[in-house]
């Protein structure tokens, strides 16, 4: 009996010592290699990998205390990937809380109004913090990856600034931009004026992309939309240069010639009636709004005045 009591006493003492040692370790300040240390946690990293990374960097004395702490708090899978800037005095428990809250440094990328998909792919490919997973994928494969129902990639991504953590894939960002565009497009489609000669939201997107390339003047968008709507209603050709330029692709040298306007191709709105088969650029929210809420006008023509604005008329005189 005395031996058993002694054994229990020893076990209790060891347990108390271990608890005390563990408490001391998780509340003691970690050691940063530099005054400000950037910790990069890659997407998909598990607790063991993160703990080993911290231990290898000399930030924590042992990976096991960090693992036990996270499991004890039931936060084994709660640490968020990203780039973290560690400064000042942090304990292991404070570090865990910091990583769980996901206060990671955000990277950003901008998609600009009027851009083509080729320009989007270029900036995605050149961004050092983005994993370029679309390399080698066809347009159709990209559409499949992002869950798009469209058959062409042009114009379906919303122009905006997108924030992301280092290591995010270009496909993830494209999917966000696609869903954002769909949300905006559906919202404005549901509020469109009646009797528009546009049968689907996608046709509205096509028209909006043309409006985007025709003017940079906010005050002209609705009026230009009104002209195009009038021409569509009357069965007139749109006769808009930006669609021809888009159809020429790399053949366009900056100078649009008469022969270009006469040469038939699927984006030549001088030779073909109706809308082109796809959008030609990323339309802004203002252009989408104009396409679905055009100005009430009798105008059928407009010409640039040279100051970024346009002059409208009912005839060519």
Regions found by a protein language model. Name each.
Residues 18-185:
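Signal peptide-directed extracytoplasmic domains
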Residues 12-20, 24, 202-206:
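Hydrophobic alpha-helical targeting segments used for export or membrane insertion
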Residues 11-12, 74, 152, 257:
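Alpha-helical interaction segments
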Residues 46, 121-122, 126-134, 144-317:
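Bacterial extracytoplasmic/cell-wall-associated proteins, especially those involved in peptidoglycan
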Residues 1-14:
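N-terminal Sec-pathway targeting helices
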